Regions:
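Activation of the activation-loop gatekeeper triad in protein kinase-fold domains
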Residues: 188-193
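Conserved short submotifs of the Hanks-type protein kinase catalytic core
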Residues: 111-124, 128
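Juxta-kinase regulatory segment immediately upstream of eukaryotic protein kinase catalytic domains
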Residues: 1-39
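ATP-binding glycine-rich loop module of kinase domains
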Residues: 39-40, 46-85
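Short beta-strand micro-motifs within the conserved protein kinase catalytic domain, predominantly
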Residues: 102-113
Length: 206
């Protein structure tokens, strides 16, 4: 049986859907999710998926983050629903920060919560280092100049976020997106909080 990792409900060819499920599907046919065309599943976990989507309203490329209740429990006892809901509030607070992924909206559908963000073109800092590392000695100077530029941009982004009263909580290479002109966008603010908050994040990053 093929394990099709589709971002939507799929039946195996040999399964006939029971009438009760078909009726329920029709009952929930009017959905906020109909405003989006899901094009790709970026990530799956028991706490919820992360999906690339296109808005059927304005055609913009988006990322939709799903949080499921009582699943994906972290070290602080928070489930994925709570973390995604919290991230939405943080991103709304940081809407004026140019180096933070753009917040669009947050909504609830059935028992799950969905956070809609802009889709950021680029690669993670982790990928950038792997792609640009100077294996030849004559590339070292150019690499060093680019790395210093990235550090300056990252420092500015962190200062801007702190000026809005927010501590990131999960700053790691995978959450730093490098764009074509070496500008950056920070993503993943699930464990961000008030900068004065002394509660641990429950993660092993800074």
């Amino acid at each position: 049986i093929p394990d099709e990792r589709n971002p939507f409900y799929t039946l195996p060819y040999f399964v006939i859907e029971p009438p009760v499920l078909s009726e329920k599907q029709e009952e929930y046919s009017d959905s906020k999710l109909d405003e989006f065309e899901i094009s790709e599943a970026i990530h799956f976990s028991n706490g919820g998926g992360v999906y690339k989507a296109i808005s059927s309203i304005d055609g913009s490329q988006l990322v939709i983050k799903e949080g499921r209740p009582e699943a994906g429990i972290d070290a602080m006892g928070r489930d994925a629903y709570t973390r995604v809901e919290h991230e939405g509030k943080i991103l709304e607070q940081l809407k004026q920060c140019s180096n933070v992924v753009g917040y669009r909206e947050i909504f609830k559908e059935w028992e799950h919560i969905f956070l809609v963000e802009e889709y950021v073109e680029g690669m993670s800092l982790q990928q950038w280092v792997a792609s640009n590392y100077p294996f030849e000695s004559n590339d070292q100077e150019e690499y060093a100049m680019k790395a210093m530029k990235l550090l300056e941009n990252l420092k500015h982004a962190i200062e801007e976020i702190h000026s809005c009263g927010v501590g990131i909580g999960d700053l790691q290479p995978a959450n730093i997106i490098i764009q074509k002109n070496l500008s950056i966008k920070l993503i993943d603010f699930e464990v961000a909080d008030n900068i004065e908050c002394e509660q641990p994040t429950g993660l092993m990053t800074i």
